[in-house]
């Protein structure tokens, strides 16, 4: 069996499997073919892969012969009947592409579709990458914000700590809370799930409560549609907190749908000049109407940084974690003898498969 690792297209810097993960496959007599230069942006050279037991090949050779092809985003290779594709393909949005691959005979696993269960945690790419996104969102905000994060008391005077508002207490939000607190800021958090209140408070942040939320506990960390009355109360509470915030980090997304607007233009107008918004939902429309994906815009004196791919700014660690998720998933579909076995009754195999 041959497992192929493709090089991602710029601006993506991650790679789906780093050199240290190769040995786990080669010891099962699985050949690992890596596209030349695939790991360079993640600080993993072709020589590193060769030393780990991989072979360096072209993308065409991988397309023509690999039984399993690993990537992060959708590959641009020709699809062969029977090939297994594994990545993070945004299957809920890219339905046409997934349908085309299925028609060409590919078996497609898009790992963001994995059920959010205890058994799936070791292969949960959403969580491993969101953890990085939450951490880097705060550092990005601190870099863009022209003031201190912590309180300072000096002979020249006192500086008040930055006020950070985090919308969404999923994996990214919780890491953002922890990082913002470490930097000395005052943190407020909003989430539609009252169940996360204890987690938020344990990290030292204030939880903004809004009664009447629809139960989102089973949504795998995503937002769910709420009632009109709740949305009205939500908008009012968020507007009040946003007007006092120096930094806002938004993380709210709904599977298969456009991200909800949580910060209106009127709210942005009410914010202090020099404030910063980091929108992690930019790729699905953004949590503000002014967000532009992969761009920084300044409106009404507020910087709005739209970036849903912050893990790519930490390519080495992000690739290591992503690759570990991939290896754990491969254990479900490759047996100890290195043979491909697709157990269609396995809830994780069935859940991750992207089909028409």
What name fits each language-model region?
Residues 68-143:
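Phosphate/diphosphate ligand-binding glycine-rich loop within oxidoreductases
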Residues 53-62, 74-75, 217-248, 252-269, ...:
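A structured beta-alpha segment of the ubiquitous adenosine-cofactor-binding alpha/beta core
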């Amino acid at each position: 069996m041959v497992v192929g690792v493709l090089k991602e297209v710029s601006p993506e810097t991650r790679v789906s499997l780093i050199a240290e993960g190769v040995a786990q496959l080669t010891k099962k007599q699985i050949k690992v073919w890596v596209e030349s230069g695939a790991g360079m942006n993640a600080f993993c050279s072709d020589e590193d892969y060769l030393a780990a037991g991989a072979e360096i090949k072209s993308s065409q050779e991988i397309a023509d012969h690999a039984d399993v092809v690993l990537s992060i985003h959708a590959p641009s290779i020709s699809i062969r009947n029977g090939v297994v594709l594994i990545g993070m393909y945004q299957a809920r949005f890219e339905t046409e592409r997934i349908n085309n691959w299925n028609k060409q005979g590919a078996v497609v696993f898009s790992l963001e579709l994995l059920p959010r269960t205890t058994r799936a945690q070791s292969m949960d790419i959403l969580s491993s990458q969101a953890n990085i996104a939450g951490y880097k969102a705060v550092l990005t905000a601190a870099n863009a914000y022209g003031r201190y994060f912590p309180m300072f008391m000096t002979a020249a005077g006192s500086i008040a700590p930055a006020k950070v508002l985090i919308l969404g207490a999923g994996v990214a939000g919780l890491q953002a809370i922890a990082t913002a607190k470490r930097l000395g800021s005052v943190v407020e958090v909003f989430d539609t799930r009252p169940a996360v209140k204890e987690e938020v408070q344990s990290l030292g942040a204030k939880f903004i409560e809004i009664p009447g939320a629809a139960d989102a506990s089973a949504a795998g960390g995503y937002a769910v549609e709420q009632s009109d009355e709740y949305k009205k109360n939500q908008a009012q509470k968020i507007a009040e907190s946003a007007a006092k915030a120096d930094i806002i980090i938004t993380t709210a997304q709904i599977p298969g749908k456009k991200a909800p607007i949580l910060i209106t233009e009127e709210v942005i107008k009410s914010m202090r000049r020099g404030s910063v918004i980091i929108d992690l939902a930019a790729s699905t429309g953004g949590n503000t109407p002014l967000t532009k994906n992969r761009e920084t815009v300044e409106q009404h004196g507020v910087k709005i940084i739209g970036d849903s791919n912050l893990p790519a700014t930490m390519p080495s660690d992000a690739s290591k974690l992503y690759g570990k998720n991939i290896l754990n998933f491969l254990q479900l579909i490759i047996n100890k003898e290195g043979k491909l076995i697709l157990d269609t009754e396995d809830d994780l195999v069935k859940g991750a498969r992207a089909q028409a």
